[in-house]
Amino acid sequence: MSDLDGFCQNAFSDLNSLNQQVFKANYAVRGALAILADEIQDDLLENPSSYPFSEIVYANIGNPQQMGQSPITFVRQVLSLCQYPTLLDHAEEKWFQNLFPTDVVQRSKMLLKESGSLGAYSASQGIPLVRRHVADFIRARDGFDCEPSDIYLTSGASHAARLIMTLIIARPTDGVMVPAPQYPLYGAQIDLMSGSMVSYSLSEENNWDIDFDQFKKSFDEASKKGINVRLCVVINPGNPTGACISENSMEKVLRFAKAKGIVLLADEVYQNNIYQNKFHSFRRKLGELREKEPDNHWDQVSLISVNSVSKGQFGECGQRGGYLDVVNIPEPAKDQILKLATIDICPPVAGQLLVDMLVNPPKPGDPSYDLFIKEVDEIHEALRLQCRQLYEGTKRMKRVSCLEPHGAMYLHPSVSLPEKLITTAKAQKIQPDEFYAIELLKRSGICVVPGSGFGQPEGDYHIRITFLAKGTEYIERFVKAHNEIMDLYE
């Protein structure tokens, strides 16, 4: 008998032999509730009368086009020609001219010339022309210099954050400060990298701004435990809170980072989802401080900012386009960021073209400008209205309080859960807010994310719900089901 006739169990036969950091990592936005929602949706297809609703409302994730947001015409016209350039052979025909304005044709030809083809690899750092346009956009937005060499195109903001955290987290005692409540991507990535998460609280009493005294306390306590805080994540506008960080808090964080040698990672993907005031980037605030205090070592503050085509008025989540830009990063370290990008080969080229259209949209006088502005304004106003409608709905819900968000796509209401519900949940070894969310899903078909998935303190109960769904019917379902749950357990 040959020694190759038998078999030996492989790595997947013993779960304990696999990377335990993967088992530890948790991404609540697409966790157990989302899986249950999919199962219920499948049940509804087979038996439409099995639940007191006809479809699931996926209010657990910021996925605008899934919830009915229309794509921007200019964006899809350019992508159409780039995906199927043979159409350009018909540019002189009437039907073509009715479908594709001249600036769409010009942009498509320019992008095809730069990329070669959407099916071809690009440079790992991204298409040079697109990076130049990103630098121009940042320069115009903030009023301070930005170079194309500081721009790295990515397959979304999540990829951008992962690149930076992969490079910075080198050992288990390397700490990353993350806001609480936090977007769970960061906690999951820290777990995967075997790093240490250091939570700092946002103040619900102060519109979810940074509680700076607690921020410093979190750093000090981590340091006493031997954790070397190397990176701090700031999310502006906030996810899940929808709040904007005040300029005063921005300055405090930048000064603290300078004093303690901490790299800042600014997640600014919701910069076009602001419903009050205007967006102020961390990059701009750093530039203002450097201009105001030229001899105060501001060139020692390393800042990475990320943006994406998934949010804002584009809502192109599935296309996977984004970028990171770096400030005050030494060239040898930038080389290592590029090395990590090279390992991934390149971001999706279609996503890179979307980034170009995000930062370099039609301008006044261009044939596509009027329609582009009309669509962008309509989407922005629709989101503002949907935000207001859902916020007003929370006022009719028992044991709920909610701050009106200033940005992003979410409400983060506080729910004072009845003691009977908490006891029932704990008896079933389920987090109380998750138990509530399951009850809500089964009664209303609305899928939300329990606050425990965002790192909320023990005994503090919230949910995150998007306001991307159109109309008010789902709000009535939400209010009715919530109040039924409260009545049942009070």
Curated annotation (Swiss-Prot):
GO terms for cellular component: mitochondrion; nucleus. Its EC number is 2.6.1.2. Keywords: Aminotransferase, Cytoplasm, Mitochondrion, Pyridoxal phosphate, Transferase. Its main location: cytoplasm. Its cofactor is pyridoxal 5'-phosphate. The keyword Transmembrane helix does not apply. The modification N6-(pyridoxal phosphate)lysine is found at residue 311. One of its GO terms (molecular function) is transaminase activity. GO terms for biological process: biosynthetic process; L-alanine catabolic process; L-glutamate biosynthetic process. Pyridoxal 5'-phosphate binds at residues 157-158, 183, 239, 308, 320. Pathway: Amino-acid degradation; L-alanine degradation via transaminase pathway; pyruvate from L-alanine: step 1/1. It is found in: Cytoplasm; Mitochondrion. It catalyses: L-alanine + 2-oxoglutarate = pyruvate + L-glutamate. Belongs to the class-I pyridoxal-phosphate-dependent aminotransferase family. Alanine aminotransferase subfamily. Alanine aminotransferase involved in both alanine biosynthesis and utilization. Homodimer. This is Putative alanine aminotransferase. It comes from Schizosaccharomyces pombe (strain 972 / ATCC 24843) (Fission yeast). The lineage of its organism: Eukaryota, Fungi, Dikarya, Ascomycota, Taphrinomycotina. The gene is alt1.
